[in-house]
Amino acid sequence: MIDKQKTIQTYAKSANDTGSTAVQVALLTERINNLSRHLTENKKDKHGQRGLQLLNGQRRRLLKYLERTNYDEYIALTDRLGIRRGQRIVR
């Protein structure tokens, strides 16, 4: 089960920070990890697989935004959460 308050406190920049990109990515990562564990035991849960795809897409979009706006924080967050990074495309 996800301990939402603990995750928010861990990744928040201030006491009232509950919606920053880093916090959102951390919460999504917790949900993704939880759902992945569920799907290893329940391989035929097709609705769960669809939900996992949606969560991964949402996290990918948030990480893309964070990479574009604050690259140093993006690097630190992906290292901290253990998320693989793609190649950086400079435009």
UniProtKB/Swiss-Prot annotation:
Q: Say yes or no: keyword rRNA-binding present.
A: yes
Q: Which GO terms describe its cellular component?
A: cytosolic small ribosomal subunit
Q: Which cysteines form disulfides?
A: none
Q: Which domain of life is it from?
A: Bacteria
Output one GO MF annotation. rRNA binding
Keywords annotated in UniProt? Ribonucleoprotein, Ribosomal protein, RNA-binding, rRNA-binding
Any one GO BP annotation for this protein: translation
Q: Which family does it belong to?
A: Belongs to the universal ribosomal protein uS15 family.
Function comment: One of the primary rRNA binding proteins, it binds directly to 16S rRNA where it helps nucleate assembly of the platform of the 30S subunit by binding and bridging several RNA helices of the 16S rRNA. Forms an intersubunit bridge (bridge B4) with the 23S rRNA of the 50S subunit in the ribosome.
Q: Quaternary form?
A: Part of the 30S ribosomal subunit. Forms a bridge to the 50S subunit in the 70S ribosome, contacting the 23S rRNA.
Q: What is this protein called?
A: Small ribosomal subunit protein uS15
Q: Which gene encodes it?
A: rpsO
